[in-house]
Amino acid sequence: MMTDNSKTRVVVGMSGGVDSSVTALLLKEQGYDVIGVFMKNWDDTDEFGVCTATEDYKDVAAVADQIGIPYYSVNFEKEYWDRVFEYFLAEYRSGRTPNPDVMCNKEIKFKAFLDYAMTLGADYVATGHYAQIKRDENGVVHMLRGLDKGKDQTYFLSQLSQEQLQKTMFPLGHLQKSEVRAIAEQAGLATAKKKDSTGICFIGEKNFKTFLSHYLPAQKGRMMTVDGRDMGEHAGLMYYTIGQRGGLGIGGQQGGDNKPWFVVGKDLSQNILYVGQGFYHESLMSTSLDASVIQFTREVPEEFTLECTAKFRYRQPDSKVTVHVKKDKAKVVFAEPQRAITPGQAVVFYDGHECLGGGIIDMAYKDGEPCQYI
């Protein structure tokens, strides 16, 4: 027997891109009562004075008309500024490297937007993320990696709670990106040929250094090796991240062994940037980390220990870890030393295909000693 989906209302977050367009199309084809909503999170114009949000909204309108669904625009600029951008700036001020996409999903797309969707009578919200939702026999929702390994976005969704996931659909999770493009082209959607957006949501394609300098004054300082050699001047600690290679302005010639130079540490109090030679420089290696803002996708005890795998940045293979959880904090011990564990970034836990949740890295340690990363 066919399920009658017509009484189930799904509000789709539509960005004007191909993924969210196909999300809306698939749900409409499956018979759901679909409404499209465009979120305006950032007041912006590109370098030609064109408001990119206006262009994106036109694409949403065109696709919604093609599919035959109602659509609205909602303004979350204040919520975005207060909950995501202020956090982003505070992290950079404290010498850390934040991941605003993780916070945007937690606070905007699956909180502010979810709340708004409920006022439209939504049973569920849906987005174009590459992740999968599976409900077990007890009604508990499990979040699984997207089938397209190169596009899986569970890393960025790792702060979602069971409550949020219960109300969420990810219709693209079982598809390859190439299939999504093909569906859009076959349906003749206005966004079928539109290129994917890159970069942080509110910066887009702009130069990151220039953008950041509008909001945080840069303080130049000394660039040093760990053993105290002065290597010149840095442009401001906020412009560098642990393990970074480019943009240092020092070639291999100063080191004697011609290995490339990397950022290996920061001292915020002295405004010193530490650099060292070699991809696996000893200062870049650590054996454990402390994390806070720990969120699991399911109900868990206040204190427990977990053997699983983890990612410490988006595009990296999983590593085996032991996680000691206490309330919203965790100590994560690595089976093998890890490179460039960066405070402010997300650590995300997995059990096979399932994303279990994650937290924000506060400090890395090497054999119990804190690494000089902030």
From Swiss-Prot:
The active site is at 104 (nucleophile), 201 (cysteine persulfide intermediate). Residues 151-153, 313-314 are annotated as: Interaction with tRNA. Disulfide bonds join 104-201. It holds the Pfam family tRNA_Me_trans. GO terms for cellular component: cytoplasm. ATP binds at residues 13-20, 39, 128. It comes from the Bacteria. Residues 99-101 are annotated as: Interaction with target base in tRNA. Signal peptide: none annotated. SUPFAM superfamilies: Adenine nucleotide alpha hydrolases-like (SSF52402). One of its GO terms (biological process) is tRNA wobble position uridine thiolation. NCBIfam families: PRK00143.1 (NF001138), trmU (TIGR00420). Catalyzes the 2-thiolation of uridine at the wobble position (U34) of tRNA, leading to the formation of s(2)U34. Belongs to the MnmA/TRMU family. This is tRNA-specific 2-thiouridylase MnmA. The gene is mnmA.
